Amino acid sequence: MSGTALVVRGLSKSFAGVLAVKDAAFSLERGRITAFLGENGAGKTTTIKMVLGFLRRDSGEVMFRARMVGYVPEQPAFFSWIKGGELLDCTLRLHGVPLERRKERIVTWCERLSLDPGLLDRRVSTYSQGNRKKFSYLQSLLVSPDLFIVDEPFTALDPTSIMDARRLFHGLAEGGAAVFLSTHLISEVEKVYDDVVIIRRGEVILRRRREDPGPPVDLETLFLSSVRSPSRRA
């Protein structure tokens, strides 16, 4: 499946008169993995929250062309009293999935994410940070999103889980989903990205496809040359 899943134009946000994001613009294509890179405080999470409607934007527009959106925050938060299985079952019930298909889908995704199904009988608040992150992946993927947004996708994951996550992103893209990864771990996203969007001090300064003409440049070099350049914007 090809085509555009999301278009962002002129997105801006200020806090107490301080500009956090200025005229951000980019698009996400189905079947491709986009890396969203920026230094701490560059505006990555603020941009994501505006795109998803968690934060009111001052100006700009966000156009969704995706049927279903999945989102994994950097630090997932859950009600302290709820068990994992109860939350997943509730998620699927809200989307009208029949009981027999709910159980099947949950088991399938537990296997794909290497998450012990036994954890689902425990409260999510008792999970380790790594399992809580994987559980957040599981909950978001149950609804079969064709736009999947992840803030710091590798945080709290061990090396094996990071490799599982990379395979997951490839599989989603091959299935036609647009995958958007906001991260600091350039070395990990280097192995999976198709497109890159770089933001510096609230401004998107570079949009590039891996296959764009020109000599091959590793992602770390591209990122450093972009954020250190005084006026680069492309």
Task: Describe the residue ranges of each PLM region.
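Conserved ABC transporter NBD signature motif
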Residues: 28, 53-56, 60-68, 206-208
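Conserved ABC ATPase signature
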Residues: 123-130
